[in-house]
C-alpha cells in the first residue's frame, strides 16, 4: 500500500509558470516594469520524474539518465499604471500609458549527482519592447541573453520518500552575462538620438548576485498535494552606473535590485485522465524597497504583484508540459529610497495576467 502511495505522490502535483525547471529557480521579469526576474520551476519529482530510480530501466546510458532539460516561455504586456495600490485610470483614458511587452525564453539543465544532489544551470533569453512617451520618447526594442545562473540543489530527505513529501534547498550564482545598457532610437528635444532603454526591458543588470531558493510538497488527502516554492535573488551591488535620463536627485543611474518570488497552493489529479493534474494557488513576486545587502540607491521601481495562479500539468513518457496563467489581484508600486528622499511617489505599469508554458524532457 505504501509503495502505491509513493507512486501516486510522484505522479501528482502541478506547478509552474515559468522558466527553468527540474526543481530549480531562474530569473525572469515580473508582470510589469518593476523589472523583477524571479520565477520558479516544476517539481518534476511529483510527476514521475526527477529521480535516478525513475529512469533505471531506460536504455540510455547511466550518465544521460541523470539529465533533465527544460525549455520555458513567458509572455505579458504591462499597461496599467499604479501608485501604491491605486490604479491611475486616467492614463488609459488619456492614452498616455506606457506599454511594455516581453517574451522570455529559458533553457535550464538539471544534472543529478545522486538521489539528493543536483547541479543546476539556466540561460534566459529576452525579447522586449517599450512604447515610451516621455523623453527620450520612442519605441525601444531590446533582446539578448539574460543573466545566467549556475548552482546546486539538495533534497532534505532521500527521494523517493515513504512520507509522500520532501523539501529541497538550492543556491545559485548569478553571472553578469546580460547587457544592462541596451539602446534604441528615441526623440529628445526634437532630435533623433540613440538612448539607453528603460531598465525594465534590459536583459541583465551587469552585476554578480546569488539566489537562495526552496521548494516543498506534501500529499494530504484524496491524492491532493500541497506545494510551496520561494526564491530570493540577492544583488549586493548598489548601482551599475547606467544612465536613466532622469533628473531627480538619486535617480540618474540604475539601481541593482534584489528580486523575490513566493508561491504555494494545491494540486489534484483529473479523474479518469492519467498523469493530468490541475493546480490552484497564489503567488507574490516583486522587488523590495531596500536590498538585504548593500545600499539601495539609484532609480528603481519597488513593489509587488499578488496573483491567483491556476495551472495544469501533463506528463507522458519522459516529457512533462506545464501551463500556468497567473492573474493579478493586487498590484502595489511602493516608494523607493529616492522617492522618500524627494518627497514623491513614482508609478509603475503592471499587466493583468501572464502566460507561462514549460516543456521538460528527462533522458
Predicted regions and their residues:
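Transmembrane beta-barrel strands of outer-membrane/channel proteins
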Residues: 69-77, 121-125, 169-175, 212, ...
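Residue-level signature of outer-membrane beta-barrel architecture
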Residues: 73-75, 111, 123, 154-156, ...
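Surface-exposed strand-loop-strand hairpins of Gram-negative outer-membrane beta-barrel proteins
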Residues: 40-47, 75-104, 200-201
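Residues that define the transmembrane beta-barrel architecture of outer-membrane proteins
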Residues: 65, 99-105, 142-148, 165, ...
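Outer-membrane pore/translocation modules
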Residues: 127-255
Amino acid at each position: 500500500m505504501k509503495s502505491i502511495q509513493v507512486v501516486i505522490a510522484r505522479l501528482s502535483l502541478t506547478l509552474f509558470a515559468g522558466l527553468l525547471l527540474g526543481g530549480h529557480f531562474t530569473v525572469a521579469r515580473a508582470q510589469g516594469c518593476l523589472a523583477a526576474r524571479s520565477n520558479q520551476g516544476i517539481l518534476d519529482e511529483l510527476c514521475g520524474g526527477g529521480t535516478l530510480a525513475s529512469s533505471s530501466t531506460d536504455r540510455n546510458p547511466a550518465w544521460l539518465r541523470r539529465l533533465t532539460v527544460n525549455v520555458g516561455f513567458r509572455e505579458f504586456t504591462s499597461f496599467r499604471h499604479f501608485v501604491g495600490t491605486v490604479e491611475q485610470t486616467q492614463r488609459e483614458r488619456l492614452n498616455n500609458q506606457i506599454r511594455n511587452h516581453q517574451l522570455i525564453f529559458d533553457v535550464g539543465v538539471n544534472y543529478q549527482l545522486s538521489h539528493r544532489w543536483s547541479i543546476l544551470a539556466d540561460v534566459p533569453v529576452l525579447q522586449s519592447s517599450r512604447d515610451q512617451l516621455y523623453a527620450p520618447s520612442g519605441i525601444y526594442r531590446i533582446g539578448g541573453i539574460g543573466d545566467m545562473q549556475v548552482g546546486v540543489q539538495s533534497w532534505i530527505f532521500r527521494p523517493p520518500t515513504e512520507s509522500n513529501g520532501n523539501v529541497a534547498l538550492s543556491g545559485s550564482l548569478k553571472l553578469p552575462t546580460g547587457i544592462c545598457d541596451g539602446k534604441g532610437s528615441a526623440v529628445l528635444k526634437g532630435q533623433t538620438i540613440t538612448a539607453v532603454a528603460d531598465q525594465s526591458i534590459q536583459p541583465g543588470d551587469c552585476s554578480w548576485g546569488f539566489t537562495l531558493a526552496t521548494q516543498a510538497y506534501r500529499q494530504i488527502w484524496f491524492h491532493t498535494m500541497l506545494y510551496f516554492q520561494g526564491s530570493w535573488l540577492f544583488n549586493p551591488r548598489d548601482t551599475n552606473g547606467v544612465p536613466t535620463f532622469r533628473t531627480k536627485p538619486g535617480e540618474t543611474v540604475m539601481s541593482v535590485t534584489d528580486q523575490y518570488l513566493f508561491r504555494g497552493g494545491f494540486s489534484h489529479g483529473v479523474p479518469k485522465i492519467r498523469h493530468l493534474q490541475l493546480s490552484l494557488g497564489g503567488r507574490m513576486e516583486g522587488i523590495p524597497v531596500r536590498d538585504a545587502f548593500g545600499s539601495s540607491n539609484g532609480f528603481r521601481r519597488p513593489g509587488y504583484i499578488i496573483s491567483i495562479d491556476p495551472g495544469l500539468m501533463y506528463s507522458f513518457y519522459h516529457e512533462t508540459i506545464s501551463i500556468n496563467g497567473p492573474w493579478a489581484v493586487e498590484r502595489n508600486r511602493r516608494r523607493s529610497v529616492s522617492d522618500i528622499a524627494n518627497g514623491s511617489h513614482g508609478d509603475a505599469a503592471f499587466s493583468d495576467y501572464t502566460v507561462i508554458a514549460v516543456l521538460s524532457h528527462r533522458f
